[in-house]
Design a protein with these regions (language model features):
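Short, contiguous, pocket-lining structural segments
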Residues: 148, 169-173, 190
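Short, conserved phosphate-binding/catalytic loop or strand-edge motifs used
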Residues: 171-181
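Short beta-strand
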Residues: 63-65, 167-173, 213-217
């Protein structure tokens, strides 16, 4: 296990010689669209410059599906004996071993281990006791229209803007949207409490539209404003990570101007995301690592 002082600086990339080797590269991970282990590794190589700022040196939680979508899957938050430890960092923070990567080879090593989804903490290895990105996950219940999800996302954005906080947005790769708030850092309790206050305010003002509890029985026709991603150890799917769902949808950063009723939440996939990235005139999240802002009261 690496100690804090043993870890190389971000983007060091000096730890390995040559790319990791894939065993059974033709193993199919998404049967419905014929995406193989090699295909997933190739995807990460192609989008590395886009995904790197959102995964490098951030503690990870991994959804492993060694036999592909539709087979048994499990979540892993700690390094495993089968992991390539030369490319997958393990980090001992007060006795807790975390998983992180620093290069595209690290991502490919995760592919080799059957990882189909990469989820991230809202922090980095440099300050694991401080949150530096909040996530509001808008998760629609049955019978909620996409237009209502879009409206909810814009309400989160506007409430944050009223507090002088800039936010960014991405598709979840499922049915919802994720609003992300970069900030200068606050302890986990402060971060979670702030995000909970936003969620509770929305449910108080529009109880017919929103709820802030996970209760499945109450979800019908409402959007769950999930603020629980903002506690220590909680995660949200990483920007540009695929989802272990039919079609291989990708959680895709978008500009706020793209967030309309016409936007399909699962529009971009492992197979077509590169086409979008080539057409973009600018990265919609270009400023996410440059924004300087503090949570209220911090």
């Amino acid at each position: 296990t690496a100690s804090r002082s043993d870890l190389p600086p971000p983007g060091g990339g000096e730890r390995t010689a040559g790319p990791p080797k894939l065993t059974n590269p033709q193993r199919v991970y998404w049967q419905d669209v014929d995406i193989t282990k090699q295909g997933l590794a190739d995807y990460y190589a192609e989008v590395w410059d886009w995904i790197a700022p959102h995964v490098v040196r951030r503690p990870l939680a991994l959804l492993r599906c060694p036999n592909g979508v539709g087979s048994e899957c499990f979540v892993q938050k700690h390094a495993h004996a089968t992991f390539d430890r030369s490319r997958i960092l393990s980090y001992d923070d007060d006795g807790e071993e975390l998983i992180a990567i620093e290069s595209v080879d690290g991502l490919v090593a995760l592919v080799q281990a059957g990882v189909l989804e990469v989820h991230v903490w809202g922090t980095t290895l440099d300050h694991v006791d401080l949150c530096d990105r909040l996530v509001f996950d808008l998760d629609p219940g049955p019978d909620v229209t996409w237009a209502a999800v879009v409206e909810g996302a814009k309400e989160v954005r506007d409430r944050l803007a009223d507090l002088k906080l800039e936010s960014f947005i991405k598709t979840s790769g499922g049915k919802g949207l994720h609003i992300v708030v970069p900030h200068d850092g606050a302890d986990w309790d402060t971060s979670k409490t702030f995000s909970k206050q936003i969620a509770l305010a929305m449910t108080a003002d529009s109880p017919q539209k929103y709820l802030a509890k996970m209760t499945k029985s109450a979800r019908q026709g409402k959007i769950f404003v999930d603020y629980l991603r903002n506690g220590r150890g909680a995660t949200a799917v990483a920007a540009y990570s695929p989802r272990a769902r039919p079609g291989a949808p990708v959680s895709t950063p978008v500009a706020w101007s793209e967030v309309t009723a016409k936007l399909s939440p699962a529009r971009w996939t492992v197979l077509n995301l590169q086409d979008r990235l080539k057409r973009l005139k600018a990265d919609p999240w270009a400023e996410i690592g440059k924004v300087k802002q503090k949570l209220p009261g911090v």
